[in-house]
Amino acid sequence: MDVRPKKQASPKGQTPKPQAQPFPLPAPIRGWWLSSNLATPEPQTALALDNWVCTTTGIRARGGKNLYATLGDPVASLFTYKSGAIEEMFGATETDIYPLTVIGDPLVTPAADVTLQTSGSYSYTQFGTAGGDFLVLANGADDVLNYDGSAWTTPAITGATSADLSAVWTFASRIFFVEGDTQSAWYLPVDSIAGAATEFSLSGIFTKGGSLLFGAKWSLDAGDGLDDKCVFVSTEGEVAIYEGTNPGSASDWRKVGLYQMPKPMGKNAFIQAGGDLLIATDVGLIPISAAIKTDLGAIEGAAVSRPITPYWQRRSRELAATRWEVIKSAKANYMVISQPDDVDPTCLVVNLQTGAWSRFTGWDTQCLTYFSDLGYFGSTNGLVYQMEVGGSDEGELYTATYLGQFENFGAPGQQKTILQARPILVQSTISAPQLTFQVDYDETLPAPPSSAADSTTSTWDGALWDDGPRDSEDAATVAAEWVA
């Protein structure tokens, strides 16, 4: 980019000769950043970064969405089952569970595997025993469900009321449950998917009231070993951490501590990432390791989402009654956080390696899952979509927007004139980028540009002569020095 300072008064007899100066503006590889000082913005960041994915070398435009399946009613949950080479996906509405592994016609609703349910708000985990691998579901309104790769069954659980169990996780070769709207957890015998459940009450542990919301295993070394902790999280953000393998044994079960976090955004709003457990709260995406060594008043500074704190906290207030979800993809190298019931459908994206944030717009992400290396989301219109497939949102165009931080170009207080600019893009198809400049901290964006002409060619002997598009011959690019 060439920038020329505005002409200034010069001594008598001299003719001012302002010189244009080039200034490079590197790609915002550090992502969307709203928490910096306007006068000293963070380098290589952006004030707006919609429909981009941050990489270690630049940013890339996201892929489109593709209709995968129709469930008819709003999609409440998506979950997967995997055993050996077998991998299956399911989707749930408030009343039914549907198989989604193989879809013939995406416009035709498949036959439901499970019907007559009263809630689609499922918590789920997978558990292996000598009898096979099982997908375990709990929703706090219907009996617990197990899937073994061929059939859904209701396990015989005694001691607790199966329909009251609202969340599920595994720890130390046991299945644990949350009893909804209480401060009690229940656990089954070792290596069992059914049987007598034993209560583990936290009513004398939690001090802020509320109820137990979810539990999880926290692996400090990103694996499965002796350093694993069992974490119990309340609706008020209290976190009770235990270690051991048998909650019924005083010698083999010990409380590590009770810690305070901000309030979580749902029973599925957490994920294991490396050696930490990340929890989406009303303040930000908080590592549990920060909760055990940081005061609640200062924990915001330890949030993984600190660059977008103003946006995150505004959305958490507006969507406080919704159930956020967090998923990650090692292949795509990013994590996705849903924001259900958002009137402006969006989801948040963060690079797993660099922590750089961006936002996907136009996606009604009510629930999320990954299946066969592809992301999927369910929407309020009863449809399930594949994420980052193709170049349009089900035939509709979308715009990738990047607004950089405001720059003084090394001359604060001086007026500048933008003479010309050249973006550097690497692309496999023709695009129609629009380049504009904003001044004086005006973040108002112009209308999106028109789409580029279709650069695809016709199949030989498959189009009308002089009607189908011809080979655009744009594969080769001539490199030359840029001259102003």
For each feature predicted by the language model, list its residue ranges:
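Surface-exposed extracellular loop regions of Gram-negative outer-membrane beta-barrel proteins
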Residues: 232-261
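Asp-box/WD-like beta-propeller blade repeats and closely related beta-sheet repeat scaffolds
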Residues: 148-172
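Short, solvent-exposed loop/turn segments at conserved positions within beta-propeller repeat blades
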Residues: 181, 226, 234, 341-344
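Structural signature of WD-repeat beta-propellers
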Residues: 92-93, 139-140, 179-180, 234-235, ...
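Structural signal for beta-propeller blades
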Residues: 97-98, 143-144, 184-186, 239, ...
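Beta-sheet repeat architectures centered on beta-propellers
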Residues: 2-110, 115-134, 260-276, 282-484
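Beta-strand-rich, repetitive solenoid scaffolds
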Residues: 91, 137-138, 146-148
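Solenoidal tandem-repeat scaffolds enriched in leucines and small polar residues
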Residues: 168-226
